[in-house]
């Protein structure tokens, strides 16, 4: 990685025990998340919003997700090619990506997967409460689950859990970047 000009390496361990393994390899746990438990109430979704499960990697879906993620204070941005890999992995693990549209424009998106016997919403963006409720209703109908766990950016007043790890590959270049940004 050093010869390729890589400054940092990041990863998300697939299993909790891998945090210890990657720590021994020089990685540090630096990305956290909080959770919110959701019970989807009984309601009739808006007729003006169409919700569909996405099966392909549409550039429009990527651009919507990317624009929402770029609004976060600290978030690793993925290229479209990385997004295609994430989507392929999501499909292999029986996960789904669901979009809400109104007047043929995306106004909401959710990425959902199963972990053990839980349903996890790793990303949920909606332009309105109607879009959010329509997404949750569709997920409930599709999976049969009323109870879901939503992963959130870390919040000070909530418990935080480790999510991702990072390792500095080229310390000299990283220190130079830091020094130039904070003289």
Spans of model-derived segments:
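Alpha-helical protein-protein interaction elements
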Residues: 13-14, 56, 75, 170
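Active-site/acyl-donor-binding loops of N-acyltransferases
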Residues: 25-45, 122-129, 137-183
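Short sequence/structural segments immediately N-terminal
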Residues: 22
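Glycine-rich acyl-CoA binding loop
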Residues: 1-2, 131-136
């Amino acid at each position: 990685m050093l010869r390729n000009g890589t400054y940092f390496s990041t990863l998300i361990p697939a299993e909790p025990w891998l945090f210890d393994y990657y720590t021994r390899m020089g990685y540090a746990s630096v990305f956290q998340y909080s959770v919110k438990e959701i019970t989807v109430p009984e309601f009739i979704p808006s007729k003006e919003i169409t919700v569909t499960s996405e099966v392909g990697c549409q550039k429009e879906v990527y651009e919507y997700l990317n624009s929402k993620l770029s609004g976060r204070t600290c978030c690793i941005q993925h290229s479209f090619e990385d997004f295609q890999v994430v989507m392929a992995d999501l499909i292999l693990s029986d996960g789904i990506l669901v979009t809400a549209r109104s007047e043929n424009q995306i106004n909401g998106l959710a990425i959902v997967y199963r972990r053990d016997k839980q349903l996890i919403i790793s990303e949920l963006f909606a332009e309105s409460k109607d879009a959010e409720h329509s997404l949750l209703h569709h997920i409930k109908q599709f999976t049969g689950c009323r109870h879901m766990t939503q992963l959130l950016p870390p919040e000070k007043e909530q418990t935080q859990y480790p999510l991702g790890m990072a390792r500095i590959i080229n310390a000299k270049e990283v220190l130079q970047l830091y020094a130039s940004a904070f003289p």
